[in-house]
Amino acid sequence: MEIDLEKFKRIHFIGIGGISMSGLAHILLEEGHTITGSDIKNSHLIERLEKEGAKINIPHMAESVIGADLVVYTAAIHDDNVEYQKAKELGIPIIDRATLLGLIMKKYKFGVAVAGSHGKTTTTSLISVILDRAGYDPTVLVGGEIDAIGGNVRVGKSEYFVTEACEYTDSFLKFYPYIAVILNVDSDHLDYFKNIDNIKQSFRQFASLVPSDGFVVACKDDANTMHVIKGLEKNIVTYGINEKSDWQAKDITYDEKGCASFNVYYRGKFIGHFKLSIPGKHNIYNALASLAVTYLLGVDTEKAKEYIKEFKGTHRRFEVKGVVEGVTVVDDYAHHPAEIHATLEAAKNYPHKRIIAIFQPHTYSRTKALLSDFAESFDAADKIIITDIYAAREKDTGIVSSKDLVDLIFKRGKDVLYIKDFDSIVEYLKENTEEGDLVLTIGAGNIYEVGEKFLEENKK
């Protein structure tokens, strides 16, 4: 069905507390819609929406949808949800999160959609900050929180829209990108996709959404990405380190905290010497992608260079949470083997005596599908603690457990422990950390609570 958002006065969100859902609700509030919603628990994102005028119920209640003109639901919501069922019974139009995002994006002339298995949040944030600082007044929806824009969403008054584009359930095929960014393509979300070929096919469809005057920005160093765009009749701009590309980083050095400095060349011409304030080689790629996108939109490269240097990262992306008794606590959202590997490589360049990695696997399907890759991804850690799998949208059917991962890591000769609950991990850290240790909480669930609690209790 063709949907005109202007016709819907009251829009109800089932699962309004999610990072993307809360951002979409914020945008619609700013546009003058009445927003209601529900979730299973309260959060600072929900409290912010309530302050802005949204009416939100905890938990889900069937009567919450009565009177709504449109209902939006998130991927975590199943058909048996009481509000979803009530909306169907009442004949209220129902759309998913990605459809709504696409409808909002469609209104903007210059939509930038950042896709890829890894690096979406940081790259989206970088592009957003550069455009914001350069005076473009963009509307932004990020899958993380950035201090520079005051959260996970920013509503501008221009024709520029920047968002992350997730491939899960082919969500990004509902978008309207003027610039489609493909950072990398990796095996993930195998509860939905059958295999890597299936994933590549989805990314190719995404790249094909770009209009004839638009652009696809792609990483030349990523073989899967190059396979995705091969023969695609679109305006393609590439970036990379190893391969000769339109945008290339050369002469890379790292400072004592693992942050890179490098020279940038555009089609062989020297552009400038760039410096990052966020650690890791992977962030060179994210910076190059951001530079390529903002250049296409007319941002001066000297200005972009300045804003890239000032960028301090986003919450939960190698976020230094604090230091207590000489122990540094860092938190990272990494939940795929490639991300964990990149995060630990960044940690290696950060001052430390030992790296203690605490990992909460995210979803049973991903843990099962990539089990041996997960085991290998911790090779750079000195000590590893694995806790129970964070189920997210799934149910535990017994196909895999954290102990299976612990066994594989142990077979690689690593110092690894399984500790079930967070309180016990905190107690273990209190008794076993030394001055100079780097404690790294890793995962897309709520594992960050361990680091926060350890810091809090040690300050007493």
Curated annotation (Swiss-Prot):
Pathway: Cell wall biogenesis; peptidoglycan biosynthesis. It comes from the Bacteria. HAMAP family: MurC. The keyword Cell wall biogenesis/degradation applies. One of its GO terms (molecular function) is ATP binding. GO terms for cellular component: cytoplasm. Its EC number is 6.3.2.8. Coiled coil: none annotated. It is found in: Cytoplasm. This is UDP-N-acetylmuramate--L-alanine ligase. It is an enzyme of class 6 (ligase). Keywords: ATP-binding, Cell cycle, Cell division, Cell shape, Cell wall biogenesis/degradation, Cytoplasm, Ligase, Nucleotide-binding, Peptidoglycan synthesis. Belongs to the MurCDEF family. GO terms for biological process: cell division; cell wall organization; peptidoglycan biosynthetic process; regulation of cell shape. The gene is murC. ATP binds at residues 116-122. It holds the Pfam family Mur_ligase. It catalyses: UDP-N-acetyl-alpha-D-muramate + L-alanine + ATP = UDP-N-acetyl-alpha-D-muramoyl-L-alanine + ADP + phosphate + H(+).
